């Protein structure tokens, strides 16, 4: 894929700060990362609903959903996984510029890729949420039957089984989805957002 040298960035006359002021809250990416089955999608759905009910401008980007459209041409090789996250990072940045609290739920197994998204954003605009859950518990849950398929060899390069997952070392938030309820996890994240004056 060739890159064009003949493109120009066109600034909007409406700034991010103006959008945030109108919304009554800051914008940021709330980036859920964790193994398949750890609760990323479940908790992120509940968080988005809670933020929406509180009158916040919010939108959720989910790993499976994005692969139905924007990233449907990508597989699960290390290179494709990285490109998947790079594209999502660019979309998330646009949504932050639009003033939204952008909730994302992606396995995003590689630390370098997550840090690449962080680097796209301004300071304090990337909130990493680690959905901590043992692979044993995730496999026990197996809501999509993916671990079973991975064990049988039907799914190669499956994170946590036949492909690596690099857990965050210093996430802004860690939720223990093996022991805490969905409601407890959402309360923990909302508390963080309020304490750090995002909302």
From Swiss-Prot:
> What top-level class of enzyme does the UniProt entry assign?
transferase
Catalytically driven reaction(s): adenosine 5'-phosphosulfate + ATP = 3'-phosphoadenylyl sulfate + ADP + H(+)
A Pfam family found in this protein is APS_kinase
EC? Answer: 2.7.1.25
Q: Which InterPro entries match?
A: APS_kinase, P-loop_NTPase
Signal peptide residues are: none
Binding residues annotated for ATP, in chain numbering = 34-41
Q: Mind listing the GO biological process terms from this record? A: hydrogen sulfide biosynthetic process; sulfate assimilation
List of catalytic residues: 108
Domain of life assignment: Bacteria
State the Gene Ontology terms under molecular function. adenylylsulfate kinase activity; ATP binding
Q: Which residues form a coiled coil?
A: none
**Functional pathway:** Sulfur metabolism; hydrogen sulfide biosynthesis; sulfite from sulfate: step 2/3
Q: Where is this region: Disordered?
A: 1-22
Per UniProt, the keywords (alphabetical) are: ATP-binding, Kinase, Nucleotide-binding, Phosphoprotein, Transferase
UniProt record similarity statement: Belongs to the APS kinase family.
Its job: Catalyzes the synthesis of activated sulfate.
Output this protein's name.
Adenylyl-sulfate kinase
Annotated gene: cysC
């Amino acid at each position: 894929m060739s890159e064009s040298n003949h493109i120009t960035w066109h600034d909007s006359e409406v700034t991010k700060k103006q959008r945030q002021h109108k919304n009554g809250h800051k914008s940021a990416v709330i980036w859920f990362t964790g193994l398949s089955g750890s609760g990323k999608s479940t908790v992120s759905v509940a968080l988005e609903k809670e933020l929406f009910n509180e009158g916040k401008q919010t939108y959720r980007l989910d790993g499976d959903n994005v692969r139905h459209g924007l990233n449907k041409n990508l597989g699960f090789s290390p290179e494709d996984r990285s490109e998947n996250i790079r594209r999502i990072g660019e979309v998330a940045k646009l949504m932050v510029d639009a003033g939204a609290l952008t909730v994302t739920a992606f396995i995003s197994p590689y630390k370098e890729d997550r840090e690449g998204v962080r680097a796209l954003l301004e300071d304090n605009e990337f909130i990493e949420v680690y959905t901590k859950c043992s692979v044993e518990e995730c496999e026990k849950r197996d809501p999509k039957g993916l671990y079973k398929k991975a064990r049988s060899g039907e799914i190669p390069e499956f994170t946590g089984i036949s492909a690596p997952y690099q857990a965050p070392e210093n996430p802004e938030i860690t939720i223990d989805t093996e022991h805490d309820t969905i409601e407890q996890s959402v309360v923990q994240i909302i508390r963080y957002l309020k304490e750090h004056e995002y909302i």
